[in-house]
């Protein structure tokens, strides 16, 4: 039972490695070594964002779990909405910070004289769009873990970290070019957000009909 419930957390951590592997493969094909160097900056930045969202999700989990077990659906709903609002505020803040301070962020990792610097400065704002949707996804995964829907949380994590990531990295570059590579991860996050909202609204509709 514990393995089943916690497998989504394991996959969520592993999905960062999957993102790095796929990203390196696609970036080196399209932009060479400079592209990989630019993408590595996003890979350094991404785990920081992950830890913030994970902290919010883990803070909400015991409250949601306790009230779910106590038969208090209204408190579960309020806690979920509070967690989503908090994560969204952080996500929007991270996105704005990425856009406004892009050059300063990149300069922390690489000198301005390298070609990778310009690639990263041009690409990070695209990549930063995903921070907003990533916030919702982490809360959604944590929510389904808390209400003993481990299988659902695992499916969401697999879609986000593998399936949608593959679609983004291999479908967008031929259509959008270089921006499409940077938008692959945001697309995966966006599709995951749509999926989470879809199943959440479906669950509420079924409950209302009962």
What residues fall within each predicted segment?
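Helix-terminus/linker motif at the lipid-water interface of multi-pass membrane proteins
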Residues: 17-44, 48, 66, 104-113, ...
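Membrane-helix interface segments
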Residues: 34-35, 150-152, 177-178
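Hydrophobic alpha-helical transmembrane segments in multi-pass membrane proteins
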Residues: 9-21, 25, 54, 86-99, ...
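Small-residue-rich hydrophobic transmembrane alpha-helices
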Residues: 38-96, 100-102, 134-156
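Structural signal for membrane-spanning alpha-helices in multi-pass inner-membrane proteins
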Residues: 5, 20, 24, 51-54, ...
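Short runs within selected transmembrane alpha-helices of multi-pass transporters and secretion channels
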Residues: 54-57, 127-146, 152-164, 168, ...
């Amino acid at each position: 039972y514990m393995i089943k419930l916690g497998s989504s957390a394991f996959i969520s951590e592993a999905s960062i490695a999957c993102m790095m592997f796929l990203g390196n493969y696609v970036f080196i094909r399209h932009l060479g070594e400079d592209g990989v160097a630019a993408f590595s900056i996003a890979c350094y930045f991404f785990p920081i964002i992950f830890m913030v969202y994970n902290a919010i999700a883990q803070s909400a989990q015991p409250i949601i779990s306790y009230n779910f077990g106590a038969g208090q659906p209204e408190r579960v709903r309020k806690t979920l909405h509070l967690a989503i609002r908090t994560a969204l505020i952080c996500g929007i803040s991270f996105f704005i910070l990425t856009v406004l301070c892009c050059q300063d962020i990149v300069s922390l990792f690489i000198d301005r004289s390298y070609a990778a610097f310009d690639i990263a400065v041009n690409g990070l704002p695209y990549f930063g769009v995903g921070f907003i949707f990533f916030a919702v996804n982490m809360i959604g995964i944590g929510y389904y873990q808390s209400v003993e829907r481990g299988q659902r949380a695992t499916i969401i994590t697999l879609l986000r970290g593998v399936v949608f990531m593959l679609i983004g990295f291999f479908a967008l570059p031929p259509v959008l070019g270089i921006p499409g590579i940077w938008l692959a991860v945001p697309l995966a996050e966006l599709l995951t957000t749509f999926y989470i909202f879809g199943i959440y609204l479906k669950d509420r509709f079924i409950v209302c009909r009962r």
